[in-house]
Amino acid sequence: MENYVNENEAALLEKVIPQNSPEDLEQFWQTAITQLRAVPLQVKRKKLRTPYDKTMSTWELRVNTHDATELVAWFSCPADAKEKLPCVVYFHGGSMYKNLHHDIVATGVCCLDMDVRGQGGESVDRADYPSGNINGALMTRGLLDRNHFYLRNIYLDAIRMMDVAASLPEVDPSRIVTYGGSQGGALSIVASAFSGHSKKCYTIFSSYCCIRQRVEKGTAIFKSVNEYLKRFPEDTDRVMENLAYFDVKNLVSFLQVPTDFCLGLADDICLPQFVYSLYHHAVCEKTIMILPFTPHYSIPTTFRDRTYFEFEAM
């Protein structure tokens, strides 16, 4: 496999897409995070009964954020825990929902997993979107105003979850990591880059990178933006300018913790050249696992097992 991967990595290096970071990108996010943290954190806990109660304890958490939305998450830790433990903050893929990660907890760590707002779970999106919102499509919500765009909201929610993890009495705040694939891979990067709580970032098949190219191709969740611009071509420059503030290809420059990336050469959603461009622009300590025939929608066992051994050793 090594020769095949090396040949493909050399080809990917020639296709790296440059960053298009706005000059005020850092200030934009500093302002947004300041606004988020100006809202005092409130966490409501309720013990849950699950099929895994013999080995782990689980609570439902209801958390306030920067707007009227209430974020709902599940927090689990080993049932026999007697001291503060590491915590994996898990971010799910697009249009999925939180889960009970008994496999992660079995490594001896806690796990926190939130429902991303507006994607079918319990976190109902209460934000006011003054523009876009074509047929309820997520990526057109607030599209013309970067201060009210959907991605701004879920990125801030991801940072909020890191604040939650650091506040929980069961968690050692010095041993928090982020983990996710696709949409979750992007949120993992954002949460590790901006929260100040992360020890390490794990990101698989990261979405929300090279957004301009995804809009041009009309792939997956960005097909709605492509359709919007067909209808309103006069908004093209404004939309592309706004999207640059949320492209993790640009935001990855703020990532300072060690990060493990993973891409599949058969991925037709988050294309290999997109994910490799993201990896290329990261300035932190980093590794990348390139899997020759792995498509989207599947967290590879090889990456997962290596990561779980690291969880066990935290």
Could you say what each language-model-derived stretch is?
Residues 35-83:
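N-terminal cap/lid segment of alpha/beta-hydrolase-fold proteins
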Residues 254-256, 261-263, 267:
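Short beta-strand/loop motif that positions the catalytic acidic residue
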Residues 1-56:
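N-terminal targeting or regulatory segments adjacent to alpha/beta-hydrolase or S9 domains
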Residues 265-270, 296-297:
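Acidic catalytic loop of the alpha/beta-hydrolase fold
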